[in-house]
Protein backbone atom coordinates (compact mmCIF):
# COMPACT_ATOMS: atom_id res chain seq x y z
CA UNK A 1 0.00 0.00 0.00
CA UNK A 2 2.05 2.98 -1.18
CA UNK A 3 2.03 6.34 0.56
CA UNK A 4 0.96 9.05 -1.87
CA UNK A 5 1.27 11.99 0.52
CA UNK A 6 3.14 12.59 3.76
CA UNK A 7 2.77 15.56 6.13
CA UNK A 8 5.25 16.01 8.98
CA UNK A 9 5.04 18.64 11.72
CA UNK A 10 7.63 19.07 14.48
CA UNK A 11 9.23 15.65 14.15
CA UNK A 12 12.86 16.18 15.19
CA UNK A 13 14.23 18.97 12.96
CA UNK A 14 11.44 18.53 10.39
CA UNK A 15 9.10 21.36 11.39
CA UNK A 16 6.70 21.53 8.45
CA UNK A 17 6.80 19.27 5.41
CA UNK A 18 4.16 18.28 2.88
CA UNK A 19 5.41 15.72 0.35
CA UNK A 20 3.82 14.19 -2.73
CA UNK A 21 5.47 10.78 -3.03
CA UNK A 22 6.29 8.40 -5.85
CA UNK A 23 4.76 4.90 -5.69
CA UNK A 24 8.17 3.61 -6.79
CA UNK A 25 11.48 5.06 -5.57
CA UNK A 26 11.82 8.11 -3.33
CA UNK A 27 15.41 9.26 -2.92
CA UNK A 28 16.34 11.54 -0.03
CA UNK A 29 19.75 13.19 -0.34
CA UNK A 30 21.48 15.34 2.26
CA UNK A 31 24.48 15.73 4.50
CA UNK A 32 24.68 14.10 7.92
CA UNK A 33 22.34 15.85 10.35
CA UNK A 34 20.21 17.36 7.59
CA UNK A 35 17.09 15.38 8.51
CA UNK A 36 17.02 12.67 5.85
CA UNK A 37 17.03 9.80 8.37
CA UNK A 38 14.36 11.63 10.39
CA UNK A 39 12.07 11.42 7.36
CA UNK A 40 12.44 7.63 7.29
CA UNK A 41 11.94 7.58 11.05
CA UNK A 42 8.67 9.50 10.67
CA UNK A 43 7.36 6.98 8.14
CA UNK A 44 8.41 4.14 10.42
CA UNK A 45 6.61 5.82 13.34
CA UNK A 46 3.41 5.96 11.30
CA UNK A 47 3.55 2.20 10.80
CA UNK A 48 4.72 1.18 14.27
CA UNK A 49 3.79 3.88 16.77
CA UNK A 50 7.43 4.03 17.82
CA UNK A 51 10.83 5.09 16.54
CA UNK A 52 13.64 2.83 15.34
CA UNK A 53 16.14 5.24 16.94
CA UNK A 54 14.74 6.30 20.34
CA UNK A 55 12.05 5.09 22.73
CA UNK A 56 11.82 8.52 24.43
CA UNK A 57 9.19 10.59 22.64
CA UNK A 58 10.41 13.92 24.04
CA UNK A 59 13.64 13.45 22.11
CA UNK A 60 11.66 13.13 18.88
CA UNK A 61 9.41 16.17 19.35
CA UNK A 62 10.98 19.38 17.99
CA UNK A 63 12.51 21.31 20.88
CA UNK A 64 10.24 24.33 20.27
CA UNK A 65 7.01 22.30 20.09
CA UNK A 66 4.69 20.50 22.50
CA UNK A 67 3.84 17.67 20.13
CA UNK A 68 4.52 16.21 16.72
CA UNK A 69 1.91 15.28 14.12
CA UNK A 70 2.29 12.84 11.24
CA UNK A 71 -0.32 12.38 8.53
CA UNK A 72 -0.32 10.24 5.42
CA UNK A 73 -2.57 9.21 2.57
CA UNK A 74 -2.41 5.55 1.56
CA UNK A 75 -3.52 4.46 -1.90
CA UNK A 76 -4.28 0.90 -2.93
CA UNK A 77 -6.15 0.49 -6.18
CA UNK A 78 -9.57 2.07 -5.77
CA UNK A 79 -9.19 2.38 -1.99
CA UNK A 80 -7.74 5.25 0.02
CA UNK A 81 -6.96 5.64 3.69
CA UNK A 82 -6.07 8.74 5.64
CA UNK A 83 -3.96 8.00 8.73
CA UNK A 84 -2.55 10.26 11.40
CA UNK A 85 -0.74 10.13 14.70
CA UNK A 86 -0.10 12.85 17.27
CA UNK A 87 2.36 12.45 20.15
CA UNK A 88 2.44 14.97 23.02
CA UNK A 89 5.20 15.70 25.51
CA UNK A 90 2.85 14.44 28.22
CA UNK A 91 3.05 11.02 26.57
CA UNK A 92 -0.51 11.05 25.24
CA UNK A 93 -1.01 9.59 21.77
CA UNK A 94 -3.89 10.22 19.38
CA UNK A 95 -4.44 7.94 16.39
CA UNK A 96 -6.84 8.51 13.54
CA UNK A 97 -7.76 6.39 10.54
CA UNK A 98 -10.10 8.05 8.03
CA UNK A 99 -10.81 10.73 10.63
CA UNK A 100 -12.00 8.29 13.31
CA UNK A 101 -10.54 8.00 16.81
CA UNK A 102 -10.32 4.86 18.92
CA UNK A 103 -7.82 3.01 16.76
CA UNK A 104 -4.84 1.00 17.97
CA UNK A 105 -1.22 0.98 16.83
CA UNK A 106 -1.85 -2.51 15.46
CA UNK A 107 -4.49 -1.04 13.11
CA UNK A 108 -1.91 1.36 11.67
CA UNK A 109 0.68 -1.40 11.43
CA UNK A 110 -1.74 -3.57 9.48
CA UNK A 111 -2.25 -0.82 6.90
CA UNK A 112 1.47 -0.10 6.50
CA UNK A 113 3.62 -3.23 6.31
CA UNK A 114 7.19 -2.03 6.01
CA UNK A 115 10.75 -3.26 6.26
CA UNK A 116 13.56 -1.03 7.47
CA UNK A 117 17.23 -1.47 6.55
CA UNK A 118 19.60 0.67 8.61
CA UNK A 119 23.25 0.41 9.69
CA UNK A 120 21.94 -0.49 13.16
CA UNK A 121 19.81 -3.30 11.69
CA UNK A 122 22.65 -5.82 11.93
CA UNK A 123 21.30 -6.66 15.39
CA UNK A 124 19.00 -9.01 13.48
CA UNK A 125 22.10 -11.16 12.96
CA UNK A 126 24.55 -10.33 15.72
CA UNK A 127 22.11 -9.24 18.43
CA UNK A 128 20.08 -11.38 20.82
CA UNK A 129 17.13 -13.66 19.99
CA UNK A 130 14.70 -10.80 20.72
CA UNK A 131 15.49 -9.23 17.34
CA UNK A 132 14.97 -12.49 15.44
CA UNK A 133 11.70 -13.25 17.23
CA UNK A 134 10.52 -9.78 16.19
CA UNK A 135 11.48 -10.64 12.61
CA UNK A 136 9.32 -13.78 12.67
CA UNK A 137 6.46 -12.14 14.53
CA UNK A 138 6.31 -9.27 12.01
CA UNK A 139 5.60 -11.79 9.27
CA UNK A 140 3.07 -13.65 11.38
CA UNK A 141 1.26 -10.43 12.27
CA UNK A 142 0.66 -9.71 8.58
CA UNK A 143 0.10 -13.35 7.62
CA UNK A 144 -2.44 -14.53 10.21
CA UNK A 145 -5.22 -12.34 11.59
CA UNK A 146 -5.41 -14.43 14.77
CA UNK A 147 -1.71 -14.17 15.60
CA UNK A 148 -1.71 -10.75 17.23
CA UNK A 149 -4.34 -11.59 19.86
CA UNK A 150 -2.58 -14.89 20.69
CA UNK A 151 0.78 -13.13 20.94
CA UNK A 152 -0.60 -10.28 23.08
CA UNK A 153 -2.36 -12.70 25.44
CA UNK A 154 0.81 -14.78 25.71
CA UNK A 155 2.82 -11.69 26.71
CA UNK A 156 0.16 -10.75 29.26
CA UNK A 157 0.11 -14.21 30.84
CA UNK A 158 3.90 -14.39 31.02
CA UNK A 159 3.98 -11.02 32.76
CA UNK A 160 1.30 -12.16 35.22
CA UNK A 161 3.08 -15.44 35.86
CA UNK A 162 6.37 -13.70 36.55
CA UNK A 163 4.65 -11.38 39.03
CA UNK A 164 2.90 -14.34 40.68
CA UNK A 165 6.21 -16.19 41.12
CA UNK A 166 7.14 -13.59 43.75
CA UNK A 167 3.93 -14.20 45.71
CA UNK A 168 2.83 -17.85 45.54
CA UNK A 169 4.16 -20.53 47.88
CA UNK A 170 3.07 -23.67 46.06
CA UNK A 171 2.70 -24.68 42.44
CA UNK A 172 -1.03 -25.28 42.96
CA UNK A 173 -1.48 -21.52 43.25
CA UNK A 174 0.30 -20.96 39.93
CA UNK A 175 -1.25 -23.79 37.94
CA UNK A 176 -4.30 -21.81 36.67
CA UNK A 177 -1.92 -19.44 34.83
CA UNK A 178 0.09 -22.32 33.45
CA UNK A 179 -2.87 -24.16 31.95
CA UNK A 180 -3.74 -21.19 29.74
CA UNK A 181 -0.11 -20.21 29.20
CA UNK A 182 0.81 -23.66 27.90
CA UNK A 183 -2.07 -23.61 25.40
CA UNK A 184 -1.08 -20.21 24.02
CA UNK A 185 2.61 -21.12 23.96
CA UNK A 186 1.88 -24.16 21.81
CA UNK A 187 -0.31 -22.14 19.42
CA UNK A 188 2.20 -19.30 18.99
CA UNK A 189 5.14 -21.68 18.65
CA UNK A 190 3.36 -23.76 16.03
CA UNK A 191 2.59 -20.61 14.04
CA UNK A 192 6.21 -19.52 14.28
CA UNK A 193 7.49 -22.93 13.24
CA UNK A 194 5.14 -23.15 10.25
CA UNK A 195 5.96 -19.63 9.10
CA UNK A 196 9.71 -20.17 9.52
CA UNK A 197 9.53 -23.33 7.43
CA UNK A 198 7.48 -21.61 4.71
CA UNK A 199 9.87 -18.64 4.63
CA UNK A 200 13.04 -20.77 4.64
CA UNK A 201 13.19 -21.51 0.86
CA UNK A 202 12.51 -17.84 0.08
CA UNK A 203 15.36 -16.80 2.34
CA UNK A 204 17.74 -19.38 0.87
CA UNK A 205 16.86 -18.34 -2.69
CA UNK A 206 17.33 -14.64 -1.98
CA UNK A 207 20.59 -15.26 -0.11
CA UNK A 208 21.87 -17.20 -3.12
CA UNK A 209 21.17 -14.12 -5.25
CA UNK A 210 23.18 -11.78 -3.00
CA UNK A 211 25.76 -14.17 -1.52
CA UNK A 212 26.28 -17.01 -4.02
CA UNK A 213 29.63 -17.87 -2.44
CA UNK A 214 27.92 -18.93 0.80
CA UNK A 215 25.43 -21.61 1.80
CA UNK A 216 23.02 -19.94 4.19
CA UNK A 217 20.99 -22.18 6.47
CA UNK A 218 18.15 -21.20 8.80
CA UNK A 219 16.60 -23.02 11.76
CA UNK A 220 13.82 -22.26 14.22
CA UNK A 221 14.09 -23.07 17.93
CA UNK A 222 10.85 -22.78 19.85
CA UNK A 223 12.35 -22.05 23.27
CA UNK A 224 11.99 -25.49 24.84
CA UNK A 225 12.93 -28.99 23.80
CA UNK A 226 11.01 -30.11 20.75
CA UNK A 227 8.53 -32.93 21.35
CA UNK A 228 8.13 -32.22 25.06
CA UNK A 229 5.01 -31.01 26.85
CA UNK A 230 5.38 -27.35 27.78
CA UNK A 231 2.85 -27.65 30.60
CA UNK A 232 5.03 -30.34 32.20
CA UNK A 233 8.14 -28.19 31.76
CA UNK A 234 6.42 -25.32 33.57
CA UNK A 235 5.42 -27.61 36.44
CA UNK A 236 8.86 -29.19 36.72
CA UNK A 237 10.61 -25.83 36.61
CA UNK A 238 8.46 -24.13 39.23
CA UNK A 239 11.06 -24.08 42.03
CA UNK A 240 13.76 -22.86 39.68
CA UNK A 241 11.52 -20.15 38.19
CA UNK A 242 10.42 -19.05 41.67
CA UNK A 243 14.03 -18.75 42.79
CA UNK A 244 14.95 -16.73 39.70
CA UNK A 245 11.77 -14.63 39.76
CA UNK A 246 10.84 -15.19 36.13
CA UNK A 247 9.89 -17.92 33.63
CA UNK A 248 13.17 -19.25 32.26
CA UNK A 249 11.92 -21.55 29.49
CA UNK A 250 9.27 -20.97 26.85
CA UNK A 251 8.29 -19.14 23.66
CA UNK A 252 9.82 -15.93 25.04
CA UNK A 253 13.20 -17.65 24.47
CA UNK A 254 12.51 -18.72 20.87
CA UNK A 255 15.14 -18.03 18.22
CA UNK A 256 15.52 -18.04 14.44
CA UNK A 257 19.16 -18.77 13.71
CA UNK A 258 21.27 -18.26 10.61
CA UNK A 259 24.41 -20.15 9.64
CA UNK A 260 26.89 -19.66 6.79
CA UNK A 261 28.60 -22.82 5.57
CA UNK A 262 27.55 -24.48 8.81
CA UNK A 263 28.86 -21.76 11.16
CA UNK A 264 27.05 -18.91 12.98
CA UNK A 265 26.93 -15.97 10.57
CA UNK A 266 28.07 -13.46 13.18
CA UNK A 267 31.31 -15.41 13.59
CA UNK A 268 32.35 -15.76 9.95
CA UNK A 269 30.86 -12.97 7.82
CA UNK A 270 32.33 -9.52 7.26
CA UNK A 271 30.22 -6.45 8.03
CA UNK A 272 29.56 -6.04 4.31
CA UNK A 273 28.38 -9.64 4.04
CA UNK A 274 26.25 -9.25 7.17
CA UNK A 275 24.58 -6.19 5.67
CA UNK A 276 23.89 -8.07 2.45
CA UNK A 277 22.42 -10.96 4.42
CA UNK A 278 20.26 -8.57 6.42
CA UNK A 279 19.04 -6.99 3.16
CA UNK A 280 18.31 -10.46 1.76
CA UNK A 281 16.27 -11.42 4.83
CA UNK A 282 14.21 -8.23 4.74
CA UNK A 283 13.61 -8.53 1.01
CA UNK A 284 12.68 -12.20 1.20
CA UNK A 285 10.16 -11.53 3.94
CA UNK A 286 8.64 -8.52 2.17
CA UNK A 287 8.39 -10.39 -1.13
CA UNK A 288 6.85 -13.40 0.63
CA UNK A 289 4.14 -11.11 2.03
CA UNK A 290 3.42 -9.80 -1.47
CA UNK A 291 3.21 -13.34 -2.86
CA UNK A 292 0.97 -14.66 -0.09
CA UNK A 293 -1.30 -11.70 0.60
CA UNK A 294 -0.96 -9.65 -2.60
CA UNK A 295 -0.10 -6.64 -0.43
CA UNK A 296 2.75 -4.28 -1.12
CA UNK A 297 5.50 -3.81 1.44
CA UNK A 298 7.31 -0.50 1.90
CA UNK A 299 11.11 -0.55 2.16
CA UNK A 300 12.98 2.10 4.13
CA UNK A 301 16.72 2.07 3.44
CA UNK A 302 18.96 4.39 5.41
CA UNK A 303 22.51 5.12 4.24
CA UNK A 304 22.21 3.00 1.11
CA UNK A 305 25.89 3.11 0.19
CA UNK A 306 27.22 2.13 3.62
CA UNK A 307 29.41 -1.02 3.57
CA UNK A 308 28.26 -2.16 0.11
CA UNK A 309 30.53 -2.14 -2.92
CA UNK A 310 29.15 -0.83 -6.26
CA UNK A 311 28.35 -4.32 -7.57
CA UNK A 312 26.31 -5.23 -4.48
CA UNK A 313 24.52 -1.88 -4.54
CA UNK A 314 23.47 -2.57 -8.11
CA UNK A 315 22.21 -6.03 -7.13
CA UNK A 316 20.15 -4.55 -4.32
CA UNK A 317 18.77 -1.83 -6.60
CA UNK A 318 17.86 -4.41 -9.25
CA UNK A 319 16.03 -6.62 -6.77
CA UNK A 320 14.11 -3.70 -5.30
CA UNK A 321 13.12 -2.51 -8.78
CA UNK A 322 11.84 -5.98 -9.63
CA UNK A 323 9.75 -6.15 -6.45
CA UNK A 324 7.56 -3.25 -7.59
CA UNK A 325 7.50 -1.95 -4.02
CA UNK A 326 7.53 1.62 -2.81
CA UNK A 327 11.06 2.35 -1.62
CA UNK A 328 12.55 5.21 0.39
CA UNK A 329 16.33 5.55 0.17
CA UNK A 330 18.68 8.01 1.86
CA UNK A 331 22.16 8.92 0.68
CA UNK A 332 24.66 11.70 1.31
CA UNK A 333 25.20 12.52 -2.38
CA UNK A 334 23.50 11.87 -5.72
CA UNK A 335 26.59 9.99 -6.86
CA UNK A 336 25.86 7.27 -4.32
CA UNK A 337 22.55 6.66 -6.07
CA UNK A 338 24.00 5.86 -9.46
CA UNK A 339 23.54 2.13 -8.85
CA UNK A 340 19.86 2.83 -8.12
CA UNK A 341 19.43 4.23 -11.65
CA UNK A 342 17.35 7.04 -10.20
CA UNK A 343 17.81 9.33 -13.18
CA UNK A 344 16.38 6.76 -15.60
CA UNK A 345 12.84 6.62 -14.26
CA UNK A 346 10.43 9.53 -14.60
CA UNK A 347 8.25 8.01 -11.90
CA UNK A 348 10.92 8.29 -9.20
CA UNK A 349 11.18 11.28 -6.86
CA UNK A 350 14.37 12.91 -5.61
CA UNK A 351 14.30 15.14 -2.52
CA UNK A 352 17.15 17.32 -1.29
CA UNK A 353 17.28 17.84 2.48
CA UNK A 354 19.04 20.73 4.17
CA UNK A 355 18.53 21.70 7.82
CA UNK A 356 15.13 20.08 7.97
CA UNK A 357 13.86 21.63 4.72
CA UNK A 358 13.15 19.62 1.56
CA UNK A 359 13.22 20.59 -2.08
CA UNK A 360 12.17 18.33 -4.94
Swiss-Prot record:
Transmembrane segments: none annotated. Keywords: ATP-binding, Cytoplasm, DNA damage, DNA repair, DNA replication, DNA-binding, Nucleotide-binding, SOS response. It is found in: Cytoplasm. PROSITE patterns: RECF_1, RECF_2. GO terms for biological process: DNA replication; DNA synthesis involved in DNA repair; double-strand break repair; SOS response. Gene3D superfamilies: P-loop containing nucleotide triphosphate hydrolases, RecF/RecN/SMC, N-terminal domain. HAMAP family: RecF. Belongs to the RecF family. The RecF protein is involved in DNA metabolism; it is required for DNA replication and normal SOS inducibility. RecF binds preferentially to single-stranded, linear DNA. It also seems to bind ATP. This is DNA replication and repair protein RecF. It comes from Actinobacillus pleuropneumoniae serotype 3 (strain JL03). The lineage of its organism: Bacteria, Pseudomonadati, Pseudomonadota, Gammaproteobacteria, Pasteurellales. The gene is recF.
